[in-house]
């Protein structure tokens, strides 16, 4: 089986699901006859400049712990960086022509945080941010943390039913969005859920379907029932409001929740992975250390980020790494654009480039690729999906990115747990997802017995450490099914570990589809297709694709006597589910491959579809 690379599995998780062995057993409950659980207390070790090794010939490894974890809030990190590098360029929003140094960014964030408090939001309230990459996104991310408000990262492609679910799930008190981006009309979509908005007093919405939602903030246009973001920020500049902010900050703790990022599993319903300041600050600090940022000059710390900010890769690996390490964050476009990413590297002298494999494929295939200047670029991060070894080699050779690193993680782990060192060899980068991060434990266990596997033997990858989320918002049972009392997080990924501690992801224990870095959950789509009046049953699988990694294939069995077409099924999807969830392939079938007990064998179904589609 091909090795899986670059897998920052944004949204991968382990939930209770019925499989051949029945319900998944939480890790805190002992497996039968288990003798080796990998339960080992953190001990002193080397700092993150040498390589920890597996212990005792078994698939257990512990990252170094001599460098201390940081007990600061996000706001304290921004304050410290602004004091240390006040005139260093902090943020460049190329498509909005915005440039701020760290002193200016801190001032703007303080005003925005003060403004949010002035309109009645308080510590612990949930505020959704819904839209493409923008200055407003970064501002709200940092301002909510500064005020103790919990940011809810909302996928900008969500349609009305998806938006309603996540806002209700976490009880959002407020939401921020632009009026429109491309064909996505945010205000009109929200009105489908909250028809009361149009006649509501700004800041005093009373919605039947979203009873917790009172405050709607528009980024760029005065709209009925909304507050304008500029006015909120302006109100925050008043001295009495800034004094209120300083008062509230005295009650913040680094262990407070700061961010809810939605992730899902084969059961289909999204769950809100809840992360604290401590989770995110330390993960971003350790990412930057692994990238050797503390030893770099300002000119060497210019990160080009074409990845979405609602994902961990963008918000933690991008924004927070910038805040903690004083790196310049360059947002190249509101949504991914390969040409704009190349222009940012060339014109802004970018030194690091983040991206998913699909993004890098598009960048390498730009018609005018050879006309861009790559003299400043030295490395970057590839994550989010399957990255073939040939792609890793092409990026390094064609883009001068000798310090490219492959990253693996999950939303529930803040997110990064394995990562290459920049100096790792080409073969080490092309053949693994790197080495364990500091202050993190990993073990690979037999899924039947729970015992540690021997080196180079596959099993389920489990993670423990500061990085593990606080839990799924409002779902203690699902949290326990994923993170037991012993705090081991079960990733659901099948992995192996070699003698040097390199981790290889060799498979998945669930049927999640990863299309161009987006996690697609088959059960969610299957439930959706069952709403079609002519559909008897639907099964969704991922089939291989050279560009996207995987594409969605819907295998549909129609009701007796009914007929429909591929085009009609796709038309049924538009406007009801996110564009990236609409299947590329629709195949009408008479039945599905089954086990003796009647369970559908999705791996066989996938094979059948790839043969049928001649992939």
Curated annotation (Swiss-Prot):
It is found in: Mitochondrion. ATP binds at residues 263-271, 493, 508, 599. The modification N6-acetyllysine is found at residues 179, 182, 199, 340, 398, 510, 544, 570. Pfam families: AMP-binding, AMP-binding_C. The modification N6-succinyllysine is found at residues 182, 478, 544, 570, 599. InterPro entries: AMP-bd_C, AMP-bd_C_sf, AMP-binding_CS, AMP-dep_synth/lig_dom, ANL_N_sf. The keyword Translocase does not apply. Residues 1-49 form a transit peptide. It is an enzyme of class 6 (ligase). Belongs to the ATP-dependent AMP-binding enzyme family. Acyl-CoA synthases catalyze the initial reaction in fatty acid metabolism, by forming a thioester with CoA. Has some preference toward medium-chain substrates. Plays a role in adipocyte differentiation. This is Medium-chain acyl-CoA ligase ACSF2, mitochondrial. It comes from Rattus norvegicus.
């Amino acid at each position: 089986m091909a090795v899986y690379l670059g897998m920052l599995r944004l949204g991968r998780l382990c939930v209770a699901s019925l499989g051949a062995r029945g319900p998944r057993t939480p890790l805190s409950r002992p497996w039968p006859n288990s003798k080796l659980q990998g339960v080992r207390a953190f001990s002193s070790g080397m700092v993150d400049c040498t390589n920890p090794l597996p212990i005792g010939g078994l698939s257990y490894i512990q990252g170094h712990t001599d460098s201390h974890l940081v007990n600061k809030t996000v706001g304290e990190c921004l304050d410290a960086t602004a004091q240390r590098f006040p005139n260093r360029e902090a943020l460049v929003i190329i498509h909005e022509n915005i440039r701020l140094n760290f002193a200016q960014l801190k001032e703007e964030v303080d005003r925005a945080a003060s403004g949010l408090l002035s309109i009645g939001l308080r510590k612990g309230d949930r505020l959704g941010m819904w839209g493409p990459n923008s200055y407003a996104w970064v501002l709200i991310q940092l301002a909510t943390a500064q005020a103790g408000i919990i940011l809810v990262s909302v996928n900008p492609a969500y349609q009305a039913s998806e938006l309603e679910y996540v806002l209700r799930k976490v009880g959002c008190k407020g939401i921020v969005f632009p009026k429109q981006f491309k064909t996505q009309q945010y205000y009109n979509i929200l009105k489908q859920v909250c028809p009361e908005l149009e006649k509501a007093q700004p800041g005093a919405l009373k919605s039947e379907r979203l009873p917790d939602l009172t405050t709607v903030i528009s980024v760029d246009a005065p709209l009925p029932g909304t507050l304008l973001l500029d006015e909120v920020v302006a109100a925050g500049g008043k001295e009495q409001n800034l004094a209120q902010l300083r008062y509230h900050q005295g009650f913040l703790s680094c262990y407070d929740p700061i961010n809810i990022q939605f992730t899902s599993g084969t059961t289909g319903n999204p769950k809100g992975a809840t992360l604290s300041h401590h989770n995110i600050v330390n993960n971003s600090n350790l990412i930057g250390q692994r990238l050797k940022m503390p030893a770099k000059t300002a000119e060497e710390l210019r990160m080009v980020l074409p990845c979405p900010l609602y994902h961990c890769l963008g918000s933690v690996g991008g924004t927070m790494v910038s805040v903690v390490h004083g790196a310049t964050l360059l947002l190249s476009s509101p949504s991914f654009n390969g040409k704009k990413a190349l222009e940012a590297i060339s014109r802004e002298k970018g030194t690091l480039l983040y991206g998913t494999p699909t993004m890098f494929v598009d960048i390498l295939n730009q018609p005018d690729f050879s006309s861009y200047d790559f003299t400043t670029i030295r490395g970057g991060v590839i994550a989010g999906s399957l990255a073939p070894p040939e792609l890793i080699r092409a990026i390094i050779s064609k883009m001068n990115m000798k310090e490219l690193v492959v990253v693996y993680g999950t939303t529930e782990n803040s997110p990064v747990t394995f990562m290459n060192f920049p100096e790792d060899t080409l073969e080490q980068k092309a053949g693994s997802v790197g080495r364990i991060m500091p202050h993190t434990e990993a073990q690979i266990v037999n899924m039947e017995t729970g015992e540690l596997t021997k080196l180079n033997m596959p099993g389920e990858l489990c993670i423990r450490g500061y990085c593990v989320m606080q839990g799924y918002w409002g779902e203690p049972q699902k949290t326990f099914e994923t993170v037991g009392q012993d705090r081991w997080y079960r990733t659901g990924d099948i992995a192996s570990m070699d003698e040097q501690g390199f981790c290889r992801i060799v498979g998945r224990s669930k049927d999640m589809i990863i299309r161009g870095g987006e996690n697609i959950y088959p059960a969610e789509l299957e439930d959706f297709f069952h709403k079609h009046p002519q559909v008897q049953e639907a099964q969704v699988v991922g089939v291989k694709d050279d560009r996207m990694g995987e594409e969605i294939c819907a295998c549909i069995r129609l009701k007796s006597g009914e007929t429909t077409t591929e085009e009609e099924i796709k038309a049924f999807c538009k406007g009801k589910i996110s564009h990236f969830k609409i299947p590329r392939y629709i195949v009408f079938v008479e039945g599905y491959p089954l086990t003796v007990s009647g369970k559908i064998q999705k791996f066989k179904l996938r094979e059948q579809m790839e043969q049928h589609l001649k992939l």
